UniProtKB/Swiss-Prot annotation:
Lineage of the organism: Bacteria, Pseudomonadati, Dictyoglomota, Dictyoglomia, Dictyoglomales
InterPro entries from the UniProt entry: Ribosomal_bL34, Ribosomal_bL34_CS
The protein's name in its UniProt record: Large ribosomal subunit protein bL34
Molecular function terms from GO: structural constituent of ribosome
Gene (UniProt): rpmH
Organism: Dictyoglomus turgidum (strain DSM 6724 / Z-1310)
One GO cellular component term: ribosome
Keyword Transmembrane in record: no
Amino acid sequence: MKRTYQPKKHHRKRVHGFLARMRTPGGRRVIKRRRAKGRKRLTV
């Protein structure tokens, strides 16, 4: 049985990247929360 995590840079960016987050209202909330918390890295 193969492992479940097969890393791909393109997929990672597409799904969890900054632009992907900004595209949806929920994603914008994520960015907002992470900014408020003071995260060094907002996405990926």
